[in-house]
Amino acid sequence: MDGEEQQPPHEANVEPVVPSEASEPVPRVLSGDPQNLSDVDAFNLLLEMKLKRRRQRPNLPRTVTQLVAEDGSRVYVVGTAHFSDDSKRDVVKTIREVQPDVVVVELCQYRVSMLKMDESTLLREAQELSLEKLQQAVRQNGLMSGLMQMLLLKVSAHITEQLGMAPGGEFREAFKEASKVPFCKFHLGDRPIPVTFKRAIAALSFWQKVRLAWGLCFLSDPISKDDVERCKQKDLLEQMMAEMIGEFPDLHRTIVSERDVYLTYMLRQAARRLELPRASDAEPRKCVPSVVVGVVGMGHVPGIEKNWSTDLNIQEIMTVPPPSVSGRVSRLAVKAAFFGLLGYSLYWMGRRTASLVLSLPAAQYCLQRVTEARHK
């Protein structure tokens, strides 16, 4: 899901200059008819315009944290509340001020659909937790992870219902604004949901799973829009989750801390120097530091800052540990309870339906006629 892609270079006479508002060399087209620009000339012209719009000292919201890579590339991390109009405005302002080369958002390929849905559709989808969604989650993640995903979706649905606001508005704004910036790419920076939930489930004992599920099932505290804005320094959804999983350190590690590492890794991958197009292979390579905007929940910002300068190994947080004996037993117990409850419900509904049908006057009349016919 990249924005505009860089065109292949052709011949052009370029010369590096430094405009007043840019901190890196800008290839300026020296001559030529604007009507007959080559691809390289057009690229250089658009790049020059972009870098001129990029402010040397951008006026950024207070929710933005600036990080600098070893090669001089800059990363502006916008800490957001997932249900906040202010966060959407912060994202728009930051992207317009810094004119980034890459925008990275806290989404994975399993949640990318929210970027293309309109607000009304998202609001309806977020409030509806159907059996079909449960079946899809179980097929995708397995029984335990699927049930956990649905319980967490219930938390999001609760906030959605309380506020009448669809989640992920800041990501949709980032997607729209990135498409307006020349040569800006759009990256998904979050760890895939199935990996996160499977690792989270594997980290809990059977009774911890039961206690967590109980807390999620009976979530009903009212929330106002003022609560969201007051929680701007700590995302509301993540704060509610932190309160519920606070007694489960392993769950916090898998859902929050490990994703901090993954998000940091993806931001560092995006923050690489950009190679400018060359008129010919004989011309020396010219690179400039890149500018990246990251859009993440406010609760992830401290972890990203902490991990920014450390060596990261994401392989170990991408593996799903094999189920333990207790895990297999708990899964069997949950399956048995689920199918037992389903069977009892069908049995009860069948008896209830039969009683209702037999109590109807028409059914009573038919039974009476059958009885009379037998006695004759």
UniProtKB/Swiss-Prot annotation:
User: Region (Disordered): which ranges?
Assistant: 1-34
Gene symbol here is: TRABD
Q: Which GO terms describe its biological process?
A: mitochondrial fusion
Per the record, residues carrying Phosphothreonine are 65
The record's annotation in PANTHER family points to: PHEROMONE SHUTDOWN PROTEIN, TRAB DOMAIN-CONTAINING PROTEIN
The record's GO CC annotations read: mitochondrial outer membrane; mitochondrion
Please name the source species: Homo sapiens
Instruction: Spell out the protein name for this chain.
Output: TraB domain-containing protein
| UniProt xrefs under Pfam families | TraB_PrgY_gumN
Q: Where is the composition biased (Low complexity)?
A: 14-27
Query: Which keywords does this Swiss-Prot/TrEMBL entry list?
Result: Acetylation, Phosphoprotein
Keyword Transcription in the entry? The reply is no
Query: N-acetylmethionine-modified residues are where?
Result: 1
**GO MF annotation terms:** mitochondrion-mitochondrion outer membrane tether activity
